[in-house]
Amino acid sequence: MATTIGFIGLGNMGGPMAANLVKAGYEVAGFDLAPACCAAAQAQGVRVVATVANAVADAEAVVTMLPAGQHVITVWTALADLVKSSTLLIDCSTIDVASARKAHGILAGKECLTLDAPVSGGTGGAKAGTLTFMAGGSAEACAKAEPILRSMGKRIVRCGEAGAGQAAKICNNMILGVSMAGVCEAFVLAEQLGLSHQALFEVASTSSGQCWALTTNCPVPGPVPNSPANNDYKPGFSAALMLKDLKLAQEASLSSGASTPLGAQAAQLYGLFEKLGHGGEDFSAIIHLLRGQLSEKRN
């Protein structure tokens, strides 16, 4: 009999992840509050159920993919009364470190194996099954979770104990936000100096300016054919999600006493970008703000 997995949160990331578990041979019982998400998951072979309790009733493992820390705490508190002590719990949401550690603590009394395992790779990686998982929890929990995670991704990095996965995700995405702002500024400067996009790309992509924000998610059309800039900035990773992660980084910076002035500046830029109505665009579209081309977007 196939291993049964309860999957809570079938949205843009969770839905494709659950579908990949089905493709890998798992029986997946899924729950989401949004009917459209449930319908999409059901079409991919997920057995959609009406409650969280139904999703985890026979589950040997539970995966949660939820919007924020408060949602994870609420669901994991409920799970403490629903799951067996042998159940493996994996949270793939991107949340603050304190909430991640609290979630682990909620299940400590049940002696369940727990893991925070946020992801990198965006919706494209979720659909393709190429996500990277940043795992926080015991070595035993990570080892038990590995076959499940490998059905949804290509790389698993155990970053440390409880909360370490979230810490790694926040730090990584602060790097991404800062580097994208820097790449965009460089293209804006090049435009003013009469240097073509292609020329700058060819130099920077093979020199010390090389980075993912340039070579994979290039913010101008042309140099990287598959980048969102060539598709009207439809998001692979939205500006709103980048802002969420930058805010989490700033919260962590404040609570830990770390100095992150560039992260703070990036958060301010993306905050303004979202306030102007562009949060649904790819985060590389911040280049329009840096060009001074944006006014408030109206529906």
For the regions a language model picked out, list residue spans one by one.
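Rossmann-fold NAD(P) dinucleotide-binding segment
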Residues: 52-114
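Rossmann-fold dinucleotide-binding core
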Residues: 5, 10, 75, 94-173
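NAD(P)+-binding Rossmann beta1-loop-alpha1 motif at the extreme N-terminus of oxidoreductases
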Residues: 1-65, 82, 86-87, 123, ...
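Helical "substrate-binding/catalytic lid" subdomain
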Residues: 165-265, 269-294
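Methionine-biased hydrophobic packing positions in alpha-helices, especially
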Residues: 13, 17, 65, 92, ...
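Hydrophobic beta-strand scaffold residues
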Residues: 28, 48, 114-115, 156, ...
